[in-house]
Amino acid sequence: ILDYSLTRPTHGPLRVAQELALQGINVSAGGVRGVWQRHDLLSKHDRLLRLEKTHREQTIELNDEQIRLLERFSPEFRERQIEVHYTGELVAVDTFFVGALKGVGKVYLQTVLDCYSRHAWGRLYTSKLPVTSVHVLNETVLPFFEAHEARVYTILSDNGREFCGRPDHHPYELFLQLEGIEHRTTKVRRPQSNGFIERLHRTLLDEHFRIKGRTIWYESVEQMQTDLDSYLDHYNTQRPHQGRMMEGQTPYSMFKKGLKLIPKEVRTKVA
C-alpha cells in the first residue's frame, strides 16, 4: 500500500484497493485508510509531501507523471534547479492583488521572500508602482537584514513595470544599484517560474486573506496591515514549514541558520 501510494499519491483509498486487487493483493478501502492513518498519509497533501521528500533524499527517480504532479502541487518544486545556499543570496519579490476595499479602492500586497529561509515580509498599498516596491524594501526588508548584520545580494522579480525599466531612470532599478543589489528577472510570460513566492501567495490566501475576508469588515488599509503583520509574525516564527530543505523548521530559525553559512569571500567582497 505504501509503495503504491508513493507511485500514485493522488489515488483515493478505493482506487488503491481496486488497483492492488488487479495485482492479486486483497485489501479493502478501509484497510488502505488504516495504513495511511498509521503513517500520517490520510491527505493527498501528505502523500505528495512524502513523494517529494523521498525524491529529495535521492531514494527514488521520478517518472514524468510524478514530476507533473509535484510541479502542480508545489511551485517550489519547479525551482529545484535553483540552489540557494545562505540567507540573502536570493530574495524573491512580487505584487499580489488582494482585492477592492469599499471607500479605498484596489489593494495590492508587495511580497518579499528570502528564498533560503522562506522568511517573508509584506506591505499593503493602494497602488502598484515602483515607489511602493522601493518602499517595502527600504522600510521593512533591508532594516531587518541590517539588524541581523546581513544584507540582500540578489533580487528576483517578474518583468512588471513596478520592478523593471531603464536602469538609468527606473526608481526600483536605481534603488537596487544604489544598494549594490543584483537584479534578476523571471522568464517572460512565465511568472510561475518564481515558484518560491507563488507558494507564499497560496498560503497567504488560504490561511489569512480568505479567512479574514469572511469574518472582518475592513475599513482601512492600516487595519488590514495590522492583521497581516500578526499573521506574518506567526508564519515566520511559529509555523513549521515542510517545503524543500525546511524539514519542519520555522523561517526565522532558518534565517538565522543561513546567516552562519554566508561565505567569507562574499562578505569580504561586499565590504
Where are these regions (language model features)?
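Short, polar/charged, Gly/Pro-enriched helix-capping and turn/loop motifs at alpha-helix termini
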Residues: 15, 30, 46, 147, ...
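RNase H-like DDE/DDD metal-dependent nuclease/strand-transfer catalytic core used by mobile genetic elements
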Residues: 26, 87-111, 115-234
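C-terminal domain-tail junction helix/linker
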Residues: 68, 75, 80, 179-181, ...
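Mobile-element integrase/transposase regions
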Residues: 42-113, 119, 132-135, 139, ...
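Basic, flexible linker segments flanking DNA-binding modules
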Residues: 4-89, 161, 169-176, 249-259
